[in-house]
Amino acid sequence: MDNNELLDNLKLIVGDTQARTGEPMNIHTTFRIGGCADYYVQPSSIEELQSLIRFLNKSDIEYCVIGNGSNLLVSDKGIRGVVIQLSDTFDEVEYIDDVTVKVMSGMMLSRLGNKLADKGLAGFEFATGIPGSVGGAVRMNAGAYGGEIKDIIVSADVLDRSGRLIS
């Protein structure tokens, strides 16, 4: 598959404005350094993300998933393959009951902390100063001040490499 064909396929999945080539990664990381991604996409729904993952794996195309780009070092040589960024459109919170929330991976920890505090929910204070998103925090078990994500997470919904949602 040539470069134009790949870009066309990515645009079919996520829309014309959400797929780009040669995207400077320094504008997507907190360190503000790094070269360009060969391809950069921002899916706007779980369904788009699933289609994207299926397509990339079926086509044997390298990809990486990022959130807010917090503490992410990108080489000046850039990133080969496709960068999938989950941030702005994956930042919803759903209040399940008095002590349980369901949060999408792109929500910033500081924003979640504020939302939980506004509802009078405690236990997340340790994470509000961590510069990152929920997805990254879960992936690396972020922690501070004696608290860790593993101490407060009940479950996670994830996509496998075939794009299947697993709870």
What name fits each language-model region?
Residues 125-127, 134-167:
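FAD-binding subdomain of flavoenzyme oxidoreductases
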Residues 3-134:
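Anion-binding (especially nucleotide phosphate/pyrophosphate-binding) glycine-rich loop
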